[in-house]
């Protein structure tokens, strides 16, 4: 069992979560998911390829626009950001082991702190990648996909690949270059493009064609670099219609697939589809899966759900058995997701602040 460097467990008192069947009264047991049970000749673990999102599980604080952080995370004691990031790796892999989850996903800035310069950012990322690599070797856990955070830093206020500032475009390209290299080093099965700020707030001051052309050029550069370093993982494009921008260029599967074909990227990139993003686009998740599947672009999914009564991305854990059945029906219909998987892009609610709540 993974332990922190001081020899203690982050989730002491919680054992490995196991399948106990539908009649179990154990709240920390699987009732329906039996990893080794065969379905259509394949183990359930191979159908799902479950992954934990590093950003929600290990970086979420519970803060919102109306109040500060609520999450109790006893392991967050280091004052040095890099030391804290390296300690967090042990916590993450203990969680993966106890949950029985084979994969994880991350943005570069989830796992390593931002530095004052690009060189410092890369140095920090390399240091954490050392720890991630050792943890993977020790536990057998794998990286489903990596990506770069091109939306949080103020430099990306006008976008990254679509920024009107050439220096911002160049910085973003360098950041993606490094993120792909680290994903490759860690044996990642894929890499995701999600342009959180690749869009507009007002068309009066937006040259849409130019921005979309720049986005395509940016993605071609990433594909070319992947070939140069020998990265053979699958590239994914993740649709989302808005938030934080009024309109985003990766609106839905139809928009993204048209973009990929128009710009000669269709042989390199498939779709990473999120349920809550489909809701924001006015679609059911099954619609997005069917559209991508029939076009040959179904790649991976982010498993969550949204609240149809609110207009933003709530990233709730999926609890609707009819919705999840529809999703799996479409996935099986189109031959499964591998090398993609099912990433739990869902966060515990602000009121669920104890470490054990991560397992529930």
Residue ranges with predicted function:
Residues 2-70, 74-87, 97-100, 181, ...:
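Histidine-acidic metal/acid-base catalytic patches
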């Amino acid at each position: 069992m993974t332990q922190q460097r001081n020899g203690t467990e982050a989730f002491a008192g919680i054992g490995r979560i196991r399948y106990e069947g539908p009649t179990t009264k154990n709240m920390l047991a699987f009732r329906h998911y039996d990893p080794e049970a065969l379905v259509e000749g394949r183990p359930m673990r191979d159908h799902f390829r479950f992954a934990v999102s590093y950003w929600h599980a290990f970086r979420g604080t519970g803060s919102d626009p109306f109040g500060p952080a609520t999450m109790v995370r006893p392991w967050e004691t280091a004052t040095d950001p890099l030391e804290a990031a390296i300690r967090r790796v042990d916590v993450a892999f203990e969680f993966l082991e106890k949950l029985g989850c084979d994969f994880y996903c991350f943005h570069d800035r989830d796992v390593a702190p931002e530095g004052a310069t690009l060189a410092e950012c890369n140095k920090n990322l390399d240091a954490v990648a050392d720890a991630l690599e050792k943890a993977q070797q020790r536990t057998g856990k794998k990286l489903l996909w990596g990506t770069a955070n091109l939306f949080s830093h103020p430099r990306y206020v006008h976008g990254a690949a679509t920024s009107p500032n050439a220096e911002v475009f160049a910085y973003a390209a360098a950041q993606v270059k490094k993120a792909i290299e680290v994903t490759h080093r860690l044996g990642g099965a894929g890499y995701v493009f999600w342009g959180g700020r690749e869009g507009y707030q007002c068309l009066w001051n937006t040259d849409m064609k130019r921005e979309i052309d720049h986005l395509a050029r940016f993605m071609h550069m990433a594909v070319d670099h992947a070939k140069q370093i020998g990265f053979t993982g699958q590239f994914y494009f993740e649709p989302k219609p808005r938030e934080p921008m009024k309109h985003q260029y990766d609106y839905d599967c139809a928009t993204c697939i048209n973009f990929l074909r128009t710009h000669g990227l269709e042989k390199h990139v498939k779709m990473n589809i999120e349920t809550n993003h489909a809701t924001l686009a006015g679609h059911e998740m099954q619609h997005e899966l069917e559209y991508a599947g029939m076009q040959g672009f179904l790649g991976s999914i982010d498993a969550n759900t949204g609240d149809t009564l609110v207009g933003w991305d709530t990233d709730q854990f999926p609890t609707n058995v009819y919705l999840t059945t529809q999703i799996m029906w479409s996935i099986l219909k189109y031959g499964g997701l591998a090398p993609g998987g099912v990433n739990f892009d869902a966060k515990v609610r602000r009121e669920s602040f104890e470490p054990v709540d991560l397992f529930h």
